[in-house]
């Protein structure tokens, strides 16, 4: 039985001339190069794309609505499932928004640990991007080498929080644990080893004729386009705009560490690749400085504020007031004052921010996530026009989107 509906199929909304040279094809939603459930409706004239329409929603889970029915602490693990390649970035952006709403200031050691987790996660995210992007173009060796190095970083993250992908390592007011014994030594050993691995990647790709042909003058994004479409991160910096939220609006202790903001002016896929490669090196600089900062901090890893943050386990087990306050926080949630905040952060893919409107209860009245992949995916509508079908997959891989944060 056919269900009557006024909604037309996607392809009927795309007007095109009925010519022999024109055709419409679907790329996805089940396609290995889509890196998720993304559907692109492409109108082709021969092999050239004349219209493109990204269709999303296949992974939609209603996360923003879920947040309205959870206490503030309860939503932290859900943020892991947005950009699941960079879970710590999501954890931090959400916790920072709640902390700003509550007026919480986290201890210095907690800030350093957060920075370490964020930069390690940035490296794993960039490694996965390089591995899959190279594989899409046919560079199998780079894929294997990137995954080899990524294992070292995932082992470091796992040693801290017990998880490799969905970390849930941060808490409102600080972090879950102090760094384990010998953690900094292992991290610094990786920082010493990794530059040689980066050189291996560049030796394989920089002078590779196929890699250059598939990335140079492909997927060109001008400054005006990047700004008009809300591009951030490497998509913006690869087009000549030197903008990094860690520099422009410093958070945690980024204003105390020295690092550069890599950028390029060509705006093509190869320029963005070079920016990514330099960002690896800047993250290593930050990690080395964090190791020095950590040694000069006191051992507190959670803010002291009974209204918003639970006491230590020892206090909960020995003090009636701490036990009662902990019970209230776990069952009813912390209750920020009425108001609204937006906190932007620099995730591996661009600007990741959370807007929260509080009505004074233990649950957000409204939560909105600003995720970079959503804006970059929308840009395909203009970015892919004029390119060849063979380059579509290469451009999609270069833009570095993840469907988990598009379909929230």
From Swiss-Prot:
GO terms for molecular function: NAD binding; NADH:ubiquinone reductase (non-electrogenic) activity; quinone binding. NDH-1 shuttles electrons from NADH, via FMN and iron-sulfur (Fe-S) centers, to quinones in the respiratory chain. The immediate electron acceptor for the enzyme in this species is believed to be ubiquinone. Couples the redox reaction to proton translocation (for every two electrons transferred, four hydrogen ions are translocated across the cytoplasmic membrane), and thus conserves the redox energy in a proton gradient. Its EC number is 7.1.1.-. SUPFAM superfamilies: HydB/Nqo4-like (SSF56762). It is found in: Cell inner membrane. It catalyses: a quinone + NADH + 5 H(+)(in) = a quinol + NAD(+) + 4 H(+)(out). It is a peripheral membrane protein. This is NADH-quinone oxidoreductase subunit D. Keywords: Cell inner membrane, Cell membrane, Membrane, NAD, Quinone, Translocase, Transport, Ubiquinone. GO terms for cellular component: plasma membrane. Belongs to the complex I 49 kDa subunit family. NCBIfam families: NuoD, PRK06075.1. It comes from Campylobacter jejuni subsp. jejuni serotype O:2 (strain ATCC 700819 / NCTC 11168). NDH-1 is composed of 14 different subunits. Subunits NuoB, C, D, E, F, and G constitute the peripheral sector of the complex. Pfam families: Complex1_49kDa. HAMAP family: NDH1_NuoD. The keyword Cell membrane applies. The keyword Disulfide bond does not apply. Its main location: membrane.
